[in-house]
Protein backbone atom coordinates (compact mmCIF):
# COMPACT_ATOMS: atom_id res chain seq x y z
CA UNK A 1 0.00 0.00 0.00
CA UNK A 2 2.12 2.88 -1.14
CA UNK A 3 0.95 6.39 -0.31
CA UNK A 4 2.80 9.65 0.29
CA UNK A 5 3.15 10.24 4.04
CA UNK A 6 2.88 13.65 5.67
CA UNK A 7 5.94 12.78 7.77
CA UNK A 8 8.06 12.58 4.58
CA UNK A 9 7.20 16.12 3.44
CA UNK A 10 8.74 19.52 4.18
CA UNK A 11 5.76 21.65 5.20
CA UNK A 12 7.56 24.91 6.09
CA UNK A 13 5.61 27.91 4.79
CA UNK A 14 3.12 25.65 2.99
CA UNK A 15 -0.67 25.92 3.24
CA UNK A 16 -1.65 22.57 4.74
CA UNK A 17 -5.26 21.34 4.89
CA UNK A 18 -5.78 18.44 7.32
CA UNK A 19 -9.02 16.45 7.11
CA UNK A 20 -9.25 15.08 10.64
CA UNK A 21 -12.00 13.20 12.45
CA UNK A 22 -13.19 15.72 15.04
CA UNK A 23 -16.73 14.33 15.12
CA UNK A 24 -17.04 14.37 18.91
CA UNK A 25 -20.08 14.43 21.20
CA UNK A 26 -20.98 17.96 22.34
CA UNK A 27 -23.33 18.92 25.17
CA UNK A 28 -24.28 22.54 25.95
CA UNK A 29 -21.36 23.83 23.88
CA UNK A 30 -18.76 21.61 25.57
CA UNK A 31 -16.92 18.57 24.18
CA UNK A 32 -17.96 15.58 26.35
CA UNK A 33 -15.54 12.97 24.96
CA UNK A 34 -12.24 14.22 23.54
CA UNK A 35 -10.71 10.92 22.35
CA UNK A 36 -10.85 11.79 18.64
CA UNK A 37 -9.43 15.29 19.10
CA UNK A 38 -6.64 13.92 21.30
CA UNK A 39 -5.81 11.38 18.58
CA UNK A 40 -5.57 14.20 15.99
CA UNK A 41 -3.44 16.57 18.08
CA UNK A 42 -0.01 15.09 17.17
CA UNK A 43 -0.77 15.52 13.44
CA UNK A 44 -1.81 19.17 13.91
CA UNK A 45 1.15 19.90 16.21
CA UNK A 46 3.64 18.32 13.78
CA UNK A 47 2.45 20.58 10.93
CA UNK A 48 2.50 23.70 13.14
CA UNK A 49 5.98 22.88 14.43
CA UNK A 50 7.28 22.78 10.85
CA UNK A 51 6.02 26.33 10.32
CA UNK A 52 3.11 25.44 8.06
CA UNK A 53 -0.04 27.53 7.60
CA UNK A 54 -2.38 24.93 9.03
CA UNK A 55 -6.08 24.46 8.35
CA UNK A 56 -8.00 21.57 9.86
CA UNK A 57 -11.56 20.52 9.11
CA UNK A 58 -14.03 17.75 9.89
CA UNK A 59 -17.70 16.86 9.91
CA UNK A 60 -19.64 16.92 13.18
CA UNK A 61 -23.01 15.22 13.55
CA UNK A 62 -25.61 15.07 10.81
CA UNK A 63 -26.79 18.57 9.94
CA UNK A 64 -28.96 19.28 6.90
CA UNK A 65 -26.34 19.63 4.17
CA UNK A 66 -25.76 23.11 2.82
CA UNK A 67 -27.27 24.89 5.84
CA UNK A 68 -25.45 26.47 8.79
CA UNK A 69 -26.71 25.13 12.11
CA UNK A 70 -25.09 26.33 15.34
CA UNK A 71 -25.85 23.00 17.05
CA UNK A 72 -23.35 21.28 14.73
CA UNK A 73 -20.68 24.00 14.73
CA UNK A 74 -17.03 23.11 15.33
CA UNK A 75 -16.77 26.05 17.79
CA UNK A 76 -16.63 23.74 20.87
CA UNK A 77 -13.72 21.92 19.18
CA UNK A 78 -11.98 25.27 18.55
CA UNK A 79 -12.38 26.21 22.23
CA UNK A 80 -10.92 22.84 23.23
CA UNK A 81 -7.95 23.29 20.86
CA UNK A 82 -7.28 26.79 22.24
CA UNK A 83 -6.72 25.23 25.68
CA UNK A 84 -4.41 22.50 24.35
CA UNK A 85 -2.26 24.36 21.81
CA UNK A 86 0.21 27.19 22.27
CA UNK A 87 -0.43 28.41 18.69
CA UNK A 88 -3.24 30.85 17.88
CA UNK A 89 -6.47 29.06 16.90
CA UNK A 90 -9.55 30.50 15.19
CA UNK A 91 -12.70 29.33 13.42
CA UNK A 92 -13.39 30.27 9.78
CA UNK A 93 -17.05 30.12 8.74
CA UNK A 94 -16.82 31.32 5.15
CA UNK A 95 -13.68 29.86 3.69
CA UNK A 96 -14.49 28.42 0.26
CA UNK A 97 -13.16 31.49 -1.58
CA UNK A 98 -9.91 31.59 0.39
CA UNK A 99 -8.46 31.95 3.89
CA UNK A 100 -5.88 34.45 5.13
CA UNK A 101 -3.51 32.52 7.37
CA UNK A 102 -0.08 33.07 8.96
CA UNK A 103 2.69 30.50 9.43
CA UNK A 104 2.31 28.76 12.79
CA UNK A 105 -1.39 29.64 13.00
CA UNK A 106 -4.24 27.11 13.09
CA UNK A 107 -7.51 27.88 11.36
CA UNK A 108 -10.38 25.44 11.90
CA UNK A 109 -12.65 25.39 8.84
CA UNK A 110 -16.30 25.08 9.86
CA UNK A 111 -18.19 21.76 9.57
CA UNK A 112 -17.75 20.43 6.01
CA UNK A 113 -21.35 19.23 6.00
CA UNK A 114 -22.52 22.86 5.97
CA UNK A 115 -21.24 22.92 2.35
CA UNK A 116 -23.63 21.80 -0.37
CA UNK A 117 -22.24 18.84 -2.30
CA UNK A 118 -19.96 17.52 0.49
CA UNK A 119 -21.58 14.10 0.79
CA UNK A 120 -21.97 13.69 -2.99
CA UNK A 121 -18.23 14.24 -3.55
CA UNK A 122 -19.13 17.26 -5.71
CA UNK A 123 -16.30 18.17 -8.09
CA UNK A 124 -16.75 21.95 -7.91
CA UNK A 125 -16.67 21.85 -4.08
CA UNK A 126 -13.67 19.48 -4.12
CA UNK A 127 -11.77 21.95 -6.33
CA UNK A 128 -12.57 24.81 -3.93
CA UNK A 129 -11.17 22.82 -1.00
CA UNK A 130 -8.10 21.93 -3.09
CA UNK A 131 -7.49 25.59 -4.00
CA UNK A 132 -7.09 26.42 -0.29
CA UNK A 133 -3.93 24.35 0.12
CA UNK A 134 -0.52 23.32 -1.17
CA UNK A 135 -0.72 20.00 0.70
CA UNK A 136 -3.86 18.02 1.53
CA UNK A 137 -3.54 15.60 4.46
CA UNK A 138 -6.14 12.83 4.83
CA UNK A 139 -6.01 11.76 8.48
CA UNK A 140 -9.59 10.63 9.18
CA UNK A 141 -9.57 6.84 8.93
CA UNK A 142 -13.12 6.75 10.33
CA UNK A 143 -14.44 8.35 7.13
CA UNK A 144 -12.01 6.75 4.64
CA UNK A 145 -14.74 4.39 3.43
CA UNK A 146 -16.91 7.30 2.25
CA UNK A 147 -16.15 9.08 -1.01
CA UNK A 148 -16.98 12.66 -0.04
CA UNK A 149 -15.60 16.01 -1.13
CA UNK A 150 -13.44 16.57 1.98
CA UNK A 151 -12.17 12.97 2.23
CA UNK A 152 -11.79 12.00 -1.44
CA UNK A 153 -12.54 14.64 -4.09
CA UNK A 154 -10.20 17.29 -2.67
CA UNK A 155 -7.29 14.84 -2.82
CA UNK A 156 -7.69 14.41 -6.57
CA UNK A 157 -7.16 18.14 -7.20
CA UNK A 158 -4.80 19.31 -4.41
CA UNK A 159 -1.18 19.90 -5.55
CA UNK A 160 -0.06 17.13 -3.14
CA UNK A 161 -2.28 14.58 -1.34
CA UNK A 162 -0.83 12.52 1.50
CA UNK A 163 -1.76 10.30 4.44
CA UNK A 164 -1.50 11.78 7.92
CA UNK A 165 0.25 9.93 10.79
CA UNK A 166 -3.03 8.57 12.21
CA UNK A 167 -4.22 7.16 8.90
CA UNK A 168 -0.75 5.73 8.16
CA UNK A 169 -0.60 3.99 11.56
CA UNK A 170 -4.10 2.60 11.09
CA UNK A 171 -3.28 1.12 7.67
CA UNK A 172 -0.01 -0.33 8.97
CA UNK A 173 -1.71 -1.98 11.97
CA UNK A 174 -4.50 -3.46 9.85
CA UNK A 175 -1.99 -4.64 7.27
CA UNK A 176 0.02 -6.35 10.02
CA UNK A 177 -3.09 -8.12 11.40
CA UNK A 178 -4.62 -9.14 8.07
CA UNK A 179 -1.90 -9.09 5.41
CA UNK A 180 0.59 -11.60 6.77
CA UNK A 181 -0.34 -12.23 10.41
CA UNK A 182 1.87 -14.00 12.93
CA UNK A 183 0.12 -17.27 13.75
CA UNK A 184 -1.99 -18.53 15.36
CA UNK A 185 -4.28 -15.68 14.31
CA UNK A 186 -7.52 -15.38 16.31
CA UNK A 187 -10.43 -13.12 15.32
CA UNK A 188 -13.31 -12.18 17.61
CA UNK A 189 -16.56 -10.99 16.07
CA UNK A 190 -19.29 -9.95 18.48
CA UNK A 191 -22.44 -7.92 18.06
CA UNK A 192 -26.12 -8.57 17.76
CA UNK A 193 -26.63 -9.80 14.21
CA UNK A 194 -24.95 -12.24 11.86
CA UNK A 195 -26.53 -10.41 8.91
CA UNK A 196 -24.63 -7.16 9.59
CA UNK A 197 -21.31 -9.00 10.03
CA UNK A 198 -21.77 -11.73 7.41
CA UNK A 199 -19.09 -10.46 5.01
CA UNK A 200 -16.72 -9.84 7.95
CA UNK A 201 -17.23 -13.41 9.19
CA UNK A 202 -16.71 -14.73 5.66
CA UNK A 203 -13.50 -12.74 5.13
CA UNK A 204 -12.05 -13.62 8.54
CA UNK A 205 -12.92 -17.31 8.19
CA UNK A 206 -10.35 -17.40 5.36
CA UNK A 207 -7.60 -15.70 7.41
CA UNK A 208 -8.11 -16.72 11.05
CA UNK A 209 -6.93 -19.97 12.62
CA UNK A 210 -9.78 -19.64 15.10
CA UNK A 211 -12.88 -17.46 14.74
CA UNK A 212 -14.56 -16.56 18.03
CA UNK A 213 -18.19 -15.44 17.85
CA UNK A 214 -20.00 -13.57 20.62
CA UNK A 215 -23.22 -11.76 21.45
CA UNK A 216 -26.32 -12.35 19.33
CA UNK A 217 -24.08 -13.76 16.59
CA UNK A 218 -23.03 -16.64 18.86
CA UNK A 219 -26.70 -17.45 19.56
CA UNK A 220 -27.25 -18.21 15.87
CA UNK A 221 -24.30 -20.64 16.03
CA UNK A 222 -25.71 -22.29 19.19
CA UNK A 223 -29.01 -22.72 17.30
CA UNK A 224 -27.10 -24.12 14.30
CA UNK A 225 -25.91 -26.94 16.55
CA UNK A 226 -29.53 -27.94 17.09
CA UNK A 227 -29.98 -26.40 20.56
CA UNK A 228 -33.05 -24.47 21.71
CA UNK A 229 -32.14 -20.79 22.20
CA UNK A 230 -35.50 -19.76 23.73
CA UNK A 231 -36.17 -16.02 23.46
CA UNK A 232 -32.54 -15.23 22.59
CA UNK A 233 -31.74 -12.76 19.83
CA UNK A 234 -30.77 -14.92 16.84
CA UNK A 235 -31.43 -15.22 13.09
CA UNK A 236 -33.13 -18.47 12.09
CA UNK A 237 -32.73 -17.75 8.35
CA UNK A 238 -28.93 -17.60 8.76
CA UNK A 239 -28.55 -21.01 10.42
CA UNK A 240 -27.46 -22.59 7.06
CA UNK A 241 -24.76 -19.90 6.74
CA UNK A 242 -23.63 -20.56 10.34
CA UNK A 243 -23.44 -24.30 9.57
CA UNK A 244 -21.35 -23.59 6.47
CA UNK A 245 -18.92 -21.45 8.50
CA UNK A 246 -18.69 -24.16 11.19
CA UNK A 247 -17.59 -26.61 8.50
CA UNK A 248 -14.98 -24.30 6.93
CA UNK A 249 -13.47 -22.66 10.02
CA UNK A 250 -12.56 -23.51 13.61
CA UNK A 251 -15.31 -21.75 15.60
CA UNK A 252 -15.46 -22.56 19.34
CA UNK A 253 -19.23 -22.36 19.99
CA UNK A 254 -20.23 -21.67 23.65
CA UNK A 255 -20.95 -24.80 25.70
CA UNK A 256 -22.30 -22.90 28.71
CA UNK A 257 -24.10 -19.55 28.90
CA UNK A 258 -25.69 -17.01 31.24
CA UNK A 259 -29.41 -16.61 30.66
CA UNK A 260 -32.25 -14.43 31.97
CA UNK A 261 -36.02 -14.39 31.56
CA UNK A 262 -36.02 -10.67 30.68
CA UNK A 263 -33.70 -8.22 28.95
CA UNK A 264 -32.96 -5.72 31.71
CA UNK A 265 -30.10 -4.42 33.80
CA UNK A 266 -31.61 -5.91 36.96
CA UNK A 267 -32.40 -9.36 35.50
CA UNK A 268 -30.96 -12.25 37.50
CA UNK A 269 -28.34 -14.33 35.67
CA UNK A 270 -28.51 -18.13 35.59
CA UNK A 271 -25.46 -20.12 34.51
CA UNK A 272 -26.32 -23.27 32.56
CA UNK A 273 -25.19 -25.63 29.76
CA UNK A 274 -25.97 -24.33 26.25
CA UNK A 275 -28.14 -27.39 25.51
CA UNK A 276 -30.54 -26.81 28.44
CA UNK A 277 -32.08 -23.43 27.56
CA UNK A 278 -35.81 -23.13 28.26
CA UNK A 279 -38.36 -21.45 25.98
CA UNK A 280 -38.72 -18.38 28.24
CA UNK A 281 -34.97 -17.80 28.63
CA UNK A 282 -32.55 -15.70 26.59
CA UNK A 283 -28.75 -15.92 26.35
CA UNK A 284 -27.11 -12.66 27.49
CA UNK A 285 -23.52 -13.78 28.11
CA UNK A 286 -21.01 -16.61 27.80
CA UNK A 287 -20.67 -19.05 30.68
CA UNK A 288 -17.45 -19.25 32.73
CA UNK A 289 -16.28 -22.51 31.15
CA UNK A 290 -16.70 -21.13 27.61
CA UNK A 291 -15.06 -17.80 28.50
CA UNK A 292 -12.07 -19.53 30.14
CA UNK A 293 -11.68 -21.76 27.09
CA UNK A 294 -11.52 -18.63 24.90
CA UNK A 295 -9.04 -17.01 27.32
CA UNK A 296 -6.72 -20.00 26.85
CA UNK A 297 -6.97 -19.68 23.04
CA UNK A 298 -6.20 -15.93 23.25
CA UNK A 299 -3.22 -16.41 25.56
CA UNK A 300 -1.59 -18.67 22.96
CA UNK A 301 -2.39 -16.42 19.98
CA UNK A 302 0.23 -14.40 18.09
CA UNK A 303 -2.26 -12.06 16.35
CA UNK A 304 -5.68 -11.00 17.67
CA UNK A 305 -8.30 -8.97 15.83
CA UNK A 306 -11.15 -7.93 18.16
CA UNK A 307 -14.46 -6.52 16.98
CA UNK A 308 -17.39 -6.66 19.36
CA UNK A 309 -18.19 -7.81 22.91
CA UNK A 310 -19.24 -11.41 23.66
CA UNK A 311 -22.21 -10.53 25.89
CA UNK A 312 -24.42 -7.68 27.12
CA UNK A 313 -21.51 -6.16 29.07
CA UNK A 314 -23.49 -2.97 29.74
CA UNK A 315 -25.48 -5.01 32.32
CA UNK A 316 -23.21 -5.86 35.33
CA UNK A 317 -24.73 -9.37 35.67
CA UNK A 318 -23.80 -10.19 32.07
CA UNK A 319 -20.37 -8.59 31.93
CA UNK A 320 -18.17 -11.47 33.05
CA UNK A 321 -17.70 -13.17 29.66
CA UNK A 322 -16.55 -9.97 27.95
CA UNK A 323 -14.29 -9.13 30.91
CA UNK A 324 -12.57 -12.56 30.87
CA UNK A 325 -12.03 -12.28 27.10
CA UNK A 326 -10.87 -8.62 27.33
CA UNK A 327 -8.36 -9.36 30.09
CA UNK A 328 -7.03 -12.39 28.19
CA UNK A 329 -6.41 -10.15 25.15
CA UNK A 330 -4.70 -7.57 27.39
CA UNK A 331 -2.45 -10.23 28.96
CA UNK A 332 -1.66 -11.99 25.68
CA UNK A 333 1.71 -11.35 24.05
CA UNK A 334 -0.02 -11.27 20.66
CA UNK A 335 -0.16 -8.24 18.37
CA UNK A 336 -3.74 -7.11 19.09
CA UNK A 337 -5.92 -4.71 17.15
CA UNK A 338 -9.38 -3.67 18.36
CA UNK A 339 -12.09 -1.68 16.58
CA UNK A 340 -15.76 -0.74 16.77
CA UNK A 341 -17.69 1.47 19.21
CA UNK A 342 -18.83 -1.25 21.63
CA UNK A 343 -15.35 -2.76 21.71
CA UNK A 344 -13.82 0.62 22.61
CA UNK A 345 -16.45 1.08 25.35
CA UNK A 346 -15.49 -2.33 26.79
CA UNK A 347 -11.77 -1.42 26.65
CA UNK A 348 -12.52 1.79 28.58
CA UNK A 349 -14.70 -0.02 31.12
CA UNK A 350 -11.98 -2.54 31.97
CA UNK A 351 -9.16 0.03 31.74
CA UNK A 352 -6.98 -2.01 29.35
CA UNK A 353 -6.32 0.55 26.58
CA UNK A 354 -2.55 0.58 27.15
CA UNK A 355 -2.42 -3.23 26.85
CA UNK A 356 -3.94 -3.38 23.35
CA UNK A 357 -1.31 -3.02 20.59
CA UNK A 358 -3.52 -0.86 18.37
CA UNK A 359 -6.98 0.61 18.88
CA UNK A 360 -8.69 1.53 15.61
CA UNK A 361 -10.56 4.82 15.43
CA UNK A 362 -12.81 3.73 12.57
CA UNK A 363 -16.08 1.84 12.98
CA UNK A 364 -17.47 1.32 9.47
CA UNK A 365 -14.08 1.88 7.83
CA UNK A 366 -12.48 -0.74 10.09
CA UNK A 367 -15.11 -3.32 9.13
CA UNK A 368 -14.92 -2.53 5.41
CA UNK A 369 -11.14 -2.89 5.47
CA UNK A 370 -11.49 -6.26 7.26
CA UNK A 371 -14.02 -7.32 4.61
CA UNK A 372 -11.36 -6.67 1.99
CA UNK A 373 -13.15 -3.69 0.45
CA UNK A 374 -11.17 -0.85 -1.09
CA UNK A 375 -11.54 2.39 0.89
CA UNK A 376 -12.10 5.31 -1.55
CA UNK A 377 -9.81 7.72 0.33
CA UNK A 378 -6.98 5.17 0.40
CA UNK A 379 -7.39 4.33 -3.30
CA UNK A 380 -7.21 8.06 -4.10
CA UNK A 381 -4.00 8.45 -2.03
CA UNK A 382 -2.44 5.44 -3.78
CA UNK A 383 -3.28 6.89 -7.20
CA UNK A 384 -1.85 10.30 -6.26
CA UNK A 385 1.37 8.64 -5.04
CA UNK A 386 1.89 7.18 -8.55
CA UNK A 387 1.65 10.57 -10.28
From Swiss-Prot:
Q: In which pathway does it act?
A: Carbohydrate degradation; glycolysis; pyruvate from D-glyceraldehyde 3-phosphate: step 2/5
- Record HAMAP family: Phosphoglyc_kinase
Enzyme kind, highest EC tier: transferase
The protein's name in its UniProt record: Phosphoglycerate kinase
Q: What chemistry does it catalyse, as a reaction equation? A: (2R)-3-phosphoglycerate + ATP = (2R)-3-phospho-glyceroyl phosphate + ADP
**Which one Pfam family would you cite for this protein?**
PGK
Keyword tags? ATP-binding, Cytoplasm, Glycolysis, Kinase, Nucleotide-binding, Transferase
Amino acid sequence: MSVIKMTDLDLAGKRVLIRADLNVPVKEGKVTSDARIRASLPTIEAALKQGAKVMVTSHLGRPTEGEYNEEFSLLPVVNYLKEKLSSPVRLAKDYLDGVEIAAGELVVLENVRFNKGEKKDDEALSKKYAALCDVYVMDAFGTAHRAQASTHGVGKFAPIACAGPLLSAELEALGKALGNPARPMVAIVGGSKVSTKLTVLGALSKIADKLIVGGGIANTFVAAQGHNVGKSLYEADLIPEAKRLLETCDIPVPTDVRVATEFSETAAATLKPANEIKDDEQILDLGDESAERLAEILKNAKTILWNGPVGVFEFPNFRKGTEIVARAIAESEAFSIAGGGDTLAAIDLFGIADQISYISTGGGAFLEFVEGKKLPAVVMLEERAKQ
